[in-house]
Structure formats: structure tokens, C-alpha cells
Amino acid sequence: MPLPILRTISLLTLAVLISACSSGSNNSTSKPPASASEVPQPTPRATCGPGSRPETGIQGRVSREDLTSGRTREGFTCNTEMIGSYSKQNNFGTVGGFKVERYTDAAGHDCAYYDTTLLFPTNLIDAQGGVNVLDMSDPTQPVLTAQLLTPAMLSPHESLVLSKERGVLAAVLGNPAFGPGVVDVYDISGDCRHPVLKSVAPVGVLGHESGFSPDGKTFYSASPGTPTLTAIDLTNLSVPVPIMTIPLKSHGLSISADGNRAYIAGGGGNMPGSSGPENASGMVILDVSEIQARKPKPTVREISRVTWPSISIPQNAIPITIKGKPYLVEIDEYTDSTTSPSGAGNIGAGRIIDISDETKPKVISNLRLEVHQPENKAVRDGDPGANLPVQGYGGHYCNVPTRVDPTIVACSMIISGLRVFDIRDPFHPREIAYFNPPTSPRNFPEESNWAMSSPSFVPERKEIWYTDGFSGFYAVRVTNGAWADK
């Protein structure tokens, strides 16, 4: 495709995303810069061991000097090594997306699933598209075994989700605003390398993000721009049935192990009994037990909500327990300038929230880098990709290897790559590792990295799988004993 046309497509994509995020951010006015007393401090940086190629400046920064000197072509690593990768070469469109899921079937086949579309299906320019299925039996040599090309899989946006308990993969058709709500459901339990399509149905109302009850029987279709959080019964995978639509805007959401709680990032809408302003951004806890129990005409109740001074765009919240105590790991995407050109450039990044009293959730610590700090804004603004509203410095997704006593959390932090934090002491997390792959020349936008995906894990081998929008799928091993077992 001619370069001027490609640039036009890319710029239109940015314009649409900015408009969509503005409508779904739930912030009616731009915020001033957070005061010094409100700005959380960066997480202590990692100590890099043998074999590392550490960053050259402040934590998380990839400078223009790094690019012009050729340093970015070597990549940046700290207590990590790449053991395998998969990507189409010389691509114009994206080759990685928002989610990486892992599933091991009864026969022992180990599989990875990841979307390749990101904002819009620009990968169709390269005759690629959909959700890639990789056989990861040998993680040093991932093998593409299938491409899922049904409507939702062609453009799932942030909705690709998997139930490990049931062996079900699902997504809702979406884009940066919202898609028409077509839900695709696949059975992966028999042979994970070759998913079996069970249904394609317009049951999701509007799509952008999703959630899945761990038992794989309730799929939630969500949109941050419209109060249309929809629960769908997947008891019969071939016949999805809408249960109800909840009047709440939801970006990312996670469901508790028993299916009775939904943890919503975003949260604008008009929930009966809401404990906060209708358009307040943050994290909301919902009681969805009547949906899980399949009660006739179920009622959903808001339990609580919480926000924080450094908020940008709440992305996802994951329930965990550490030593028997419940917490959430939440991450904001991008900066507040993404949704408002007059924004102060506040970077939300990540945090840990204590929900021991679920009626009074409380932020207890933060997951952020030195480059995220307001005092470093002038320094970072000239870095490659830093001023693109859909790239830049900031967070996008976090995930944990287990929800019970996880020792680490791994987060995609866009230009800063994959970052790994030790959370055994949730009040005092610390960075232990990072991986930012070598960059490659690009026509537009300029050469940089675009780590956006929720990662998956192989704890027994200390591996983390994730994707970069520009360079594809990576299997990364944490080295030097940085990832503690307990």
C-alpha cells in the first residue's frame, strides 16, 4: 500500500480512538496535574544480573538518543531472555494485539492464542488477520496451527478471553469505540491446536472488552462508551443466550473464582444504589451472584467503587489473594492526554487495591516507572512514539500466573516493554525484570515498540508470553532467580 494512504489510515485510526476514548473515559473535564502529595512514587527498579542489556537512563525510558545510536536495535533486557518468537516479517499492519492466552489440553498439547488486530484490522493489508493459534510444545519454535477468522476473531479488540476450567475461547466483535456485539465461541478442550467453532451470534449488544466466569458458563460483553454490560449464558456453547444487560460502562472486567463478583475498570453509568457520581472513573465491585445462580430476573448490586488521583483510563482489575487476604491488581492505560488534548499528561499506570473490606476498597501501593513521573514529562516527550495518543509511555495490561498467592505480576507498558514486579509484599512491590525487544525500521509511525497485550505464564519454566503490536509474539524466560517460587 502506498505510504501516503497508509499514513492517512493511521491518522484516521488515531482520530477515531481519541473520540472513542473521550466518550468512554467518564471524565467530563480534564484534570489538572496531580499535586506533589498525590503523585505516587515509582516502584523500586530492578537490579539486573548477568546477561542483561539494561536501559541507559531513567527506569522505563527509551530515548531518541537510544534510537539514533542504534541501541534500540539490540533491545533492553534485565533478568530476562527471549527463548522463542513468532511474527510475519516486513509487515505494514499490526502483528500483535491485546491478549495472549495459554491453554493445555488433556493430551498435553500446549497452545497460545493471541489477537493480531489491535485498533483496526490493518493486518489485512498483509493478507493476515484474526486470532493466531500457536503450538507451543517447543517454546523455542512456536508453530502456527490455525488462524481464527470468524467475525469477532477478526476484530476482537480487547475481548479475547479463555476459560481454562472448561476449555472455551470466546470474543465479541469490537473496536476502539464499540462493535456490533457479535460473539464467537470456540471449544478448545479436545485439541487446543485446532479450535472447534461452536457458535457465532449477535448476543453481545456492543463490544470492546469482555469477562468470563471461571467455569466458562457466563460470558460478559462490555463497552467503555455505552452502559451495556451484557451477561450471556454459554451453558450450551452452540446456543448463547443473553441473560441481562447491566446499565454500566465497563472497560476491562474480571470475575471472581466463584462467579459472584465482577470487578469493573471504568464504571460510568447509572447503577441503582451507586456509591459514586454517575460519570466517575475508577474501579467498581458488582454483586453478580444472581446471574451466576441463574435466578429468574436477576438483580445486580453495586457494592463499592474507588478512584485515585493519578487516574488516566482504567483498563482492568484482577482479583488475587496473598496469604489469604484479598486484593486487586488494577492498571490504567495511556495518559489523561489521550482522552483530552488539554490533559496534564498524568500517567495512571498500575496499583494494588486492598479489598479486605469490599465495601471500602483502598489503594495500598503502585506499579509504575520513573519515566511515568510528572517531573519527567518534558524529558520523555521527545522520545520515539511518546506523543502518539495510542502509544506513548504508560500502562496497558497486567496479569498474574495464579490468582492464589502470586509472587509476580507482569505488565505491558507500551514503549517500555514487558515489566515484571515482585508482589509478595503487596504494600511494597518492586520491579525484578523487564524485556523490551529490538526495534525494527518502520515507515509509520517511527521505530519503537508497542507492548499492549495481557501476558500469559508458564510458571514451571519461568516463562512469560506476550505480544508487541509491531513485532509479534514472544516467549520470554525470567533469569537469574529473579522470579521467586514463594
Task: Give a label for each model feature.
Residues 1-10:
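Bacterial N-terminal signal peptides that target proteins for export
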Residues 17-20:
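C-terminal motif of bacterial Sec signal peptides marking the signal peptidase cleavage site
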Residues 27-29:
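Periplasmic/extracellular, small/polar-rich flexible segments of pilin-like filament-forming proteins
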Residues 31-486:
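Feature marking well-ordered beta-strand scaffolds used for ligand recognition
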